[in-house]
């Protein structure tokens, strides 16, 4: 597969001299189908394609490529049969004959079609060579299908982009005509599926925040985040600044996604097996402990927290949690942009380590960066968590009860003095999982429902499926994935493309002034050094120790140098570091200095990490 192409694009461009095409080469619409002759959906789609060709005429070019059903000998024989008669100009005759069979394709059908088309005597010289050429052509189409992300047959590509919508003529026509809704949806999907997209969104939001903060609009921009919003009821009011609503409210979605990802990794993911989990766990622990210790060594206590303090418990002492964090989105985005220069196994390792890192950051925030505890509200939060546990234990799979209780939980957690975003983690623990369904049984059930509906004739054509049928199909759809998996699938892109960019926009703005430096130089140097040096040092030290002691094994797919490069990328603290800094430094000047240090340390870590990984691969290619 071409690594430069998005995963939902045609890997192999259409070639009229090679491909089987119907329609002019300069047609504005090219519809490519990967299909199988032994597949009822492909035969049904053949009729839809005929309607589309009739509707669009010379505006459309149709291309057929083989993707025989896996494990079906008759499907493979049919595809090779068609290809073996390609040179005699009978491809489309055979194609239409095979696609027009209404019953399940059999060997007798092939004999009948050959007889009907009078192909018995059409035996080219060198039968073995013809058969081999046909096999090679089918194999080439299968390879192209796999590289283009084809999973089912038929799969359509419209002007090079995979079409994932319904197979009815109206839906296909709208996609082919490029309606505004379809174009916007397709562009959004392309961007979202591009691996570096989340990092780019964060980078743009950060750059915008910094530019606006240092422009003539800076005072208004910063004042906007301090606008107070809330609910007033009679003489009572609950108000927070817009920035606090984002940091304490909107960011709950991010922590909910993190919690669901942690849950997945420890149940069916890379952390489910001890042997594969130990290396990233060791790396994450080292990558948290060493930067924190380095910060405490390098950074002085700073000014006292309050008048009358003896200075030993200074304001800067609480910032040791800042360099512990890793921004997974940025780190993975950089690895993805380097393509094949970075082994897939290293990306898996860094992702797993970042998950463990998130657990550590959550624990640190809960214990060290929460306010004064209010026992009554904390007890209420525990009671709500108990209700969530009862729902989980009782097999309640609807999302709405969990969402409602999750909102109530957030209120009590916020009021208790514990950081409110931890409500997202607690909620994630109780969102239920389920064993995988019996797909064959669900498919038969859905087929039975739809077959019964089609017997209603004109009524179903005018009004669609009946309400009982829709409810039954909804139940089948709900069973396809667990509530936890469904919630993660829906919330993860919203967290990446909405929550985190908004958080960066609200928190990354810093006015760069010479006054920020001055007495804050030790704080800034210590924070940046802990990120740039502490992270890779902790990664390497902990992983080498774990491997030497026999607790973990390092895959051969990547070298120690590449692991060090991943450790350097883990020094990109950014969003989580900004979040912890916002809790650790209540003073505006301290927070501004910490933000500059986080930016500088993260940028330097990114440059060092990319350089190490780039040169490590070049060195391996030079000395295989």
From Swiss-Prot:
SUPFAM superfamilies reported in the protein's UniProt record: Thioredoxin-like
Top-rank lineage group of the source organism: Bacteria
Keyword tags: Antiport, Cell inner membrane, Cell membrane, Ion transport, Membrane, Sodium, Sodium transport, Transmembrane, Transmembrane helix, Transport
Spans annotated as Na(+)/H(+) antiporter NhaA: 165-624
Pfam families per the UniProt record, alphabetical: Na_H_antiport_1 (PF06965), Thioredoxin_4 (PF13462)
Chief location: membrane
GO CC terms, sorted: plasma membrane
Key word Membrane present: yes
Gene Ontology terms describing biological process: regulation of pH
Family of this protein: Belongs to the NhaA Na(+)/H(+) (TC 2.A.33) antiporter family.
Family annotation (HAMAP family): NhaA
Protein name: Na(+)/H(+) antiporter NhaA
Species this chain originates from: Nitrosospira multiformis (strain ATCC 25196 / NCIMB 11849 / C 71)
Lineage of producing organism: Bacteria, Pseudomonadati, Pseudomonadota, Betaproteobacteria, Nitrosomonadales
Gene of this entry: nhaA
